[in-house]
């Protein structure tokens, strides 16, 4: 169903269900249904004013957008010398099942909502000087009071230039401080004393399966160009080589003592509503949330989510495995298969769904996990 005629012409390009603000999305239409204005409110504080310019109410999903309440990338931040600032926040993978009304923002026509955030909490602002902030993205939309996603609205903010004092920015508490966290499969392959045997076995099995699935997908890339085109929008040899190499790197990283630190539980305390798992790309760490443990070991639904493909998705977010690390430009087969190639190649779900959809060779087994 399409009911936002102002964006119908670009809906095929912005089809991702969830999209991080990104500089790679197509140019915004001149008459945007959703208008976003960035306003400076302090050294590193920003206010985003989101306005519904359309003639119908919008029920906007906040996940992975400028309205996300988690410490995610709300804006792109670029130093005056052209260098993009390191992102130190989280890349959450959200479950799209049973979405509650609380994760939506409802905007009547011409109404606005304000979101205030501090970019210093999730960006490494190590140098004083001028920074340019901008935001682009596609917001999933439900109709009326419903929570079923039926469309997307595109937004592009103004470019905001801010003079930032790095010394003041350094005083802002970071979303993820350097402290000791337990519950990790350590780099020597041992088991942390706080990681229960049950959780250890669940994650170890999922890693083994992810390694097998990603490796099989990597080896099969060259054998079916049309299947590759289905997921990545191209059969360019360089793109196929890149995906094959990345899938093999993901397979090799799906181990206890590899480049990724796999945690047994949410020792960072960021498993908020509908978060399945999340990655800290600046630290190459992955944290599972309770929805992860209730996923199938192997799903019998084509292109569906299970434990191994969730770990493949998270591995693609880690710069120790994939450079540049993948973002979340879209979730789900219907959306990722319509991304333009440059976004598909940098979208974590394209890798996990491609691997699961084509090379998932195991019988389905549903395991409901007990946290004890």
From Swiss-Prot:
Lineage of the species this protein comes from: Eukaryota, Fungi, Dikarya, Ascomycota, Pezizomycotina
Annotated disulfide bonds: 195-264, 271-289
Catalytically driven reaction(s): Preferential cleavage of bonds with hydrophobic residues in P1'. Also 3-Asn-|-Gln-4 and 8-Gly-|-Ser-9 bonds in insulin B chain
Protein's job: Secreted metalloproteinase that allows assimilation of proteinaceous substrates. Shows high activities on basic nuclear substrates such as histone and protamine. May be involved in virulence.
Location of the active site: 314
Protein name as annotated: Neutral protease 2 homolog MGYG_06241
SUPFAM superfamilies according to UniProt: Metalloproteases ('zincins'), catalytic domain (SSF55486)
Propeptide: 20-188
Residue ranges the record marks as coiled coil: none
Organism: Arthroderma gypseum (strain ATCC MYA-4604 / CBS 118893)
GO-annotated biological processes: proteolysis
One of the record's GO cellular component terms: extracellular region
Domain of life of the organism encoding this protein: Eukaryota
Pfam families, per database record: Peptidase_M35
Family: Belongs to the peptidase M35 family.
Signal peptide: 1-19
Example GO molecular function: metalloendopeptidase activity
Cofactor annotation: Zn(2+)
Entry's localization field: Secreted
Gene3D superfamilies, alphabetized: 2.60.40.2970, Collagenase (Catalytic Domain)
Binding site for Zn(2+): 313, 317, 328
Primary localisation category: secreted
Enzyme Commission code(s) on record: 3.4.24.39
Keywords: Cleavage on pair of basic residues, Disulfide bond, Hydrolase, Metal-binding, Metalloprotease, Protease, Secreted, Signal, Virulence, Zinc, Zymogen
Co-factor remark: Binds 1 zinc ion per subunit.
């Amino acid at each position: 169903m399409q009911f936002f005629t102002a964006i119908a012409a670009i809906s095929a390009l912005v089809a991702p269900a969830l999209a991080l603000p990104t500089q790679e999305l197509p140019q915004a239409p001149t008459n945007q249904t959703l208008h976003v204005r960035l306003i400076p409110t302090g050294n590193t504080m920003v206010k985003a004013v989101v306005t519904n310019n359309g003639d119908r109410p919008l029920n906007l999903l906040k996940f992975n957008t400028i309205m996300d309440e988690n410490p995610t990338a709300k804006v792109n931040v670029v130093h005056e010398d052209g260098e993009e600032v390191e992102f130190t926040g989280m890349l959450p993978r959200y479950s799209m099942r049973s979405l509650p009304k609380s994760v939506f923002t409802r905007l009547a026509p011409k109404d606005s909502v304000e979101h205030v955030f501090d970019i210093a909490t999730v960006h490494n602002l190590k140098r004083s000087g001028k920074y340019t902030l901008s935001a682009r993205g596609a917001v999933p939309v439900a109709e009326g009071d419903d929570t079923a996603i039926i469309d997307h609205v595109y937004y592009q903010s103004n470019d905001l230039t801010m003079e930032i004092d790095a010394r003041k920015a350094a005083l802002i508490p970071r979303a993820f401080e350097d402290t000791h966290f337990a519950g990790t499969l350590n780099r020597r392959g041992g088991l942390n004393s706080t990681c229960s045997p049950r959780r250890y076995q669940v994650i170890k099995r999922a890693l083994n399966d992810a390694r097998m699935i990603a490796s099989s997908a990597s080896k099969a890339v060259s054998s079916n160009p049309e299947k590759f085109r289905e997921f990545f929008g191209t059969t360019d040899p360089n793109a196929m080589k890149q995906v094959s190499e990345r899938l093999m790197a993901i397979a090799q990283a799906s181990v206890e003592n590899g480049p990724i630190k796999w945690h047994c539980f949410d020792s960072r305390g960021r498993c908020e509503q509908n978060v399945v798992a999340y990655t800290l790309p600046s630290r190459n760490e992955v944290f599972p949330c309770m929805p992860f443990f209730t996923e199938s070991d192997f799903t019998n639904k084509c292109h569906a989510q299970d434990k191994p493909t969730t770990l493949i998705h998270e591995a693609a977010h880690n710069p120790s495995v994939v450079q540049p690390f993948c973002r979340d430009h879209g979730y789900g087969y219907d959306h990722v298969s319509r991304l333009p190639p440059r976004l598909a190649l940098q979208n974590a779900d394209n890798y996990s769904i491609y691997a699961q959809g084509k090379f998932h060779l195991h019988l389905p087994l549903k395991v409901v996990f007990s946290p004890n």
